[in-house]
């Protein structure tokens, strides 16, 4: 702990199980989603492959950055933390089904609620100084 504190890190003690579950949500699930989205984009009809690359918007580019991670490392993480990742994937699948249903039903109110709840999470991340665009994660005190 002293080592990390001297480097400017904040430390928190948690059990191995809690660590693995939290990381399955905050790191492993986003990687699964990124790999799936990029695979979906490139496995579209071949006639659109060049267009997908040429017109890739910020969202797809963000996912390709994540999906370009070391395959061997992520294979090992997915295997080692499979129990938690599968549990989180099941929850994600339910949310995705709800999202799909709202789109299919053209339920604008439900979509707005979904968007607003996730937008609030972003605000909380910024408030907690977890903005990763900065080299010090926004923690440096001026």
Model-derived regions: residue spans:
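Charged/polar positions within long, soluble alpha-helices
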Residues: 34, 38, 68, 97, ...
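Long, positively charged, glycine-interspersed low-complexity recognition regions
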Residues: 120-142
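Internal alpha-helical scaffold of NAD(P)-dependent oxidoreductase catalytic cores
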Residues: 1-64
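Interdomain hinge/lid region at the active-site interface
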Residues: 49-118
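Alpha-helical scaffold segments in carbohydrate-active enzymes
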Residues: 28-31, 117, 121-124
């Amino acid at each position: 702990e002293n080592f990390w504190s001297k480097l400017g890190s904040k430390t928190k003690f948690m059990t191995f199980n809690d660590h693995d579950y939290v990381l399955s949500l905050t790191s492993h699930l986003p990687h699964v989603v990124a790999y799936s989205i990029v695979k979906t984009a490139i496995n579209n009809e071949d006639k659109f492959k060049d267009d997908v690359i040429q017109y890739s918007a910020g969202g797809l580019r963000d996912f390709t950055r994540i999906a370009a991670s070391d395959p061997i490392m992520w294979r090992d993480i997915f295997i080692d933390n499979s129990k938690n990742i599968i549990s989180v994937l099941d929850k994600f699948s339910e949310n995705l089904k709800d999202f799909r249903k709202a789109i299919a039903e053209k339920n604008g109110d439900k979509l707005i609620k979904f968007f607003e709840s996730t937008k609030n999470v972003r605000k909380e991340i910024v408030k907690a100084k977890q903005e990763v665009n900065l080299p010090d994660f926004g923690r440096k005190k001026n």
